[in-house]
């Protein structure tokens, strides 16, 4: 379950993390009232479960209460990547130029089967951009879920990342953040930026917090926080089909069988010069109907300009995959180019079925690299028109 910024901050506050003051507003008048209470410049921030709020105009500095009201009018009701803004967080403004911005986060790292603490001096930026351009600037440290993050480990990470200020207090914040992640069964916690002012004291200005859906039965006190209307409609629809689906910001729809192969597919799409629009795992042993529904789901995404299907058939039969894709084409659901790599069980039967259809929309390639390259070309060409 994804949490709003203000909810993530509330959890971190419960664990002793120093977070930026803020209150939630649902009307422009409430925005004005909060700004008046604070008696200083504020920032009005859209509360939606997607990234890129600032670039979309959903985060605005407001030097006066009248400007806060005006910005509240602009942001409330705004559409950001398909989600309507129904509430905003009004926070006290901070003079960013007077200090330094850092990044700290905790993720579930399946490669090492544990949590990984991440820290970077490149705060205030999307961490994915930092990872792509300068991965050496992200310091990673495995966290034992039994013992948790120890203070000396946190200080060591802060030093390696090049953090300045009161390192003991920064390390203490990292320890408390990791404690929140572990005790709340989080799959992701980020503080970005973590602001360190002239006094050296760290302050969490923005947060991301996502709790493992499979662990929500242990956190019934947070059940009321889930807002289906605040989640992406495609993610809600995917949950009805039982798909493991995550909406991303790219232009190539990605579909595969198994989390590992789908993660690899995302990397291959990036390598090909495009960006994945989603993560979609159809699971093992998927029949034609499952594939049909998966293609239907991805095709509904207006961001998707081409679809990359990457299947290695074991218990998933390649001919069942082909049947599902072909049926979607026949029903008029599939209107975007599909570039496929299918190997394994019933591979020859799948090739025969697709050859019989002989549609330019559906093309097979011998390797996933070739299929991803072609999908990327199709998607980028469509966007360039």
UniProtKB/Swiss-Prot annotation:
Mg(2+) binds at residues 192, 206. Keywords: ATP-binding, Ligase, Magnesium, Metal-binding, Nucleotide-binding, Tricarboxylic acid cycle. It catalyses: succinate + ATP + CoA = succinyl-CoA + ADP + phosphate; GTP + succinate + CoA = succinyl-CoA + GDP + phosphate. InterPro entries: ATP-grasp (IPR011761), ATP-grasp_succ-CoA_synth-type (IPR013650), ATP_grasp_subdomain_1 (IPR013815), Succ-CoA_synthase_bsu_CS (IPR017866), SUCC_ACL_C (IPR005811), Succ_CoA_ligase-like_bsu (IPR005809), Succinyl-CoA_synth-like (IPR016102). One of its GO terms (biological process) is succinyl-CoA metabolic process. The keyword Transport does not apply. ATP binds at residues 45, 52-54, 94, 101. It comes from the Bacteria. Heterotetramer of two alpha and two beta subunits. Succinyl-CoA synthetase functions in the citric acid cycle (TCA), coupling the hydrolysis of succinyl-CoA to the synthesis of either ATP or GTP and thus represents the only step of substrate-level phosphorylation in the TCA. The beta subunit provides nucleotide specificity of the enzyme and binds the substrate succinate, while the binding sites for coenzyme A and phosphate are found in the alpha subunit. This is Succinate--CoA ligase [ADP-forming] subunit beta.
């Amino acid at each position: 379950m994804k949490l709003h910024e203000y909810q993530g901050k509330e959890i971190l506050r419960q664990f002793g993390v120093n977070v930026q003051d803020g209150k939630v507003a649902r009307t422009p008048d409430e925005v004005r009232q909060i700004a008046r209470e604070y008696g200083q410049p504020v920032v009005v921030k859209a509360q939606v479960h997607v990234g890129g709020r600032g670039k979309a105009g959903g985060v605005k500095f407001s030097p006066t209460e009248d400007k806060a009201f005006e910005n509240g009018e602009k942001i409330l009701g705004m559409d950001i990547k398909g989600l309507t803004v129904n509430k905003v967080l009004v926070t006290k403004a901070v003079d960013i130029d007077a200090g330094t911005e850092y990044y700290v986060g905790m993720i579930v790292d399946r490669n090492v089967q544990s949590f990984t603490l991440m820290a970077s001096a490149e705060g205030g930026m999307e961490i994915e951009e930092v990872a792509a351009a300068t991965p050496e600037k992200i310091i990673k440290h495995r966290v034992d879920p039994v013992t948790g993050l120890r203070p000396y480990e946190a200080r060591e990470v802060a030093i390696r990342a090049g953090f300045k200020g009161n390192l003991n207090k920064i390390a203490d914040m990292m320890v408390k953040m990791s404690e929140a992640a572990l005790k709340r069964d989080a799959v992701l916690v980020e503080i970005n930026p973590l602001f360190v002012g002239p006094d050296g004291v760290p302050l969490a200005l923005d947060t991301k917090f996502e709790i493992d859906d499979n662990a929500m039965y242990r956190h019934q006190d947070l059940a009321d926080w889930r807002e289906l209307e605040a989640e992406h409609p495609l993610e809600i629809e995917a949950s009805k089909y039982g798909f493991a689906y995550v909406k991303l910001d790219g232009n190539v729809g990605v579909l595969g069988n198994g989390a590992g192969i789908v993660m690899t597919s995302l990397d291959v799409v990036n390598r090909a010069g495009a960006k994945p629009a989603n993560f979609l795992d159809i699971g093992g042993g998927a029949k034609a109907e499952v594939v049909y529904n998966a293609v239907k789901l991805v095709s509904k995404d207006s961001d998707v300009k081409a679809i990359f299907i990457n299947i290695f058939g074991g218990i998933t039969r390649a001919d069942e995959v082909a049947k599902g894709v072909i049926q979607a084409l026949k029903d008029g659901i599939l209107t975007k180019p599909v570039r496929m790599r299918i190997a394994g069980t019933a591979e020859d039967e799948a090739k025969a079925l697709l050859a019989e259809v002989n549609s330019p929309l559906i093309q097979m390639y011998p390797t996933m690299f070739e299929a991803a390259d072609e999908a990327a070309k199709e998607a980028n060409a469509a966007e360039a028109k």
